[in-house]
Amino acid sequence: MSNSKHSSTIITLLCITSMLCACSRSNWKLVWQDDFNGSGIDYTVWSHTDRGNADWANTQSKDPRCYEMRGGCLVLKGIVNDNLESDTAHYLTGGIWTKGKHAFDCGRIEVRARLQGAKGAWPAIWLLPFDTENNRWPNGGEIDIMERLNHDTIAYQTMHSYYTLNLKQDNNPPHYTTAPIKPNDFNVYGVDILPDSLVFHVNGKRTFTYPRINTDKPGQFPFYIPQYLLIDMQLGGSWVGAVDPSQLPVEMEIDWVKHYQPRKK
């Protein structure tokens, strides 16, 4: 058997194994959740995301107008900034993360969310290594559970690493997929972080598997480590494009976040 055929067989077997893990909910035990039923954000777990220079972070704001607890959901908003003297960003967006506070020790992470569409809107749910000091980006990887652009009826599910970015091995194996969503309703976005693969799913249906493979190239699968979770609304950027302020405000409703671990056999 040739090496290419052997590698293909291994990847296929991993995908089948991962698919079974993703589809069988009985294999998982709920170990933590936040259902956002309180009167405010639980700051023992969450913080507001920091403003930064990257496209995803350059409108992040602690402005209370970007946050609301409503109907058992946390609502993250994107708004027009009407006071450029106090903040030079033309738009302000809400975002939260568990950085430095709460680690997700692999397993299954799911988020139930409803996303409003708007031109230039870019809501995201994603994971980065909890140990930021020893896992500088992209060496520790990035797991994008959900990104949605504008009024799209699909979500992007992606992973990044030193292997895919620096070594440009983003198709060996493929590193992302798109999955259909209910654009005006709640959807459950999830990923299983397993020793041998990442398994993405939407509404309980497996959408994509990224396997660990045998390779002499470094950094192919750094993901099986504790992670922190980011949930943020963003407006504008080179990927999503220009914002139409007439379509604002725009909202991202978070119903719950759940973390599962495999049941012991």
Model-derived regions: residue spans:
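Bacterial Sec-dependent N-terminal signal peptides
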Residues: 1-27
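GH16 jelly-roll
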Residues: 23-265
